[in-house]
Amino acid sequence: MGYYYRWEDFPPREISYLKGRPEASKLLVRIMSSARMMVTQINAKKGAFVPLHHHEAEQIILVLKGQIRGTTGKEAPQMIGPGGIWVVPSNMPHRVEYVEDTEAIEVVSPPRMDNFVGYTLSHTFFDE
């Protein structure tokens, strides 16, 4: 049996794992998850960023509008614009800076439960 939704079915919200950080209000997401993957619609204001972090999930980000600066591991930062795709392997430290107002789609597998409840143990997510 298939399931059909619209993004409007999922209310925009701040990212739970950024709760309490000043950059949280510049990032709004809509999240849809199945048992094995999660898709997130990202709307970010210029200047928003997600600090260096890592997680079990593999991550793919497709930029639809705007520009991001993505850093993977110790590699040089890369500018990613409309149509650009960034693939982040599992447990690889990475960070993202939103250089312009940006719209993007993110796919992760397995789903990241921290997007829903936030991490409760210290040093399990942020690396800076």
Write out the residue ranges for each language-model feature:
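Glycine- and acidic-residue-biased ligand/ion/polar-headgroup-sensing regions
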Residues: A57-I68
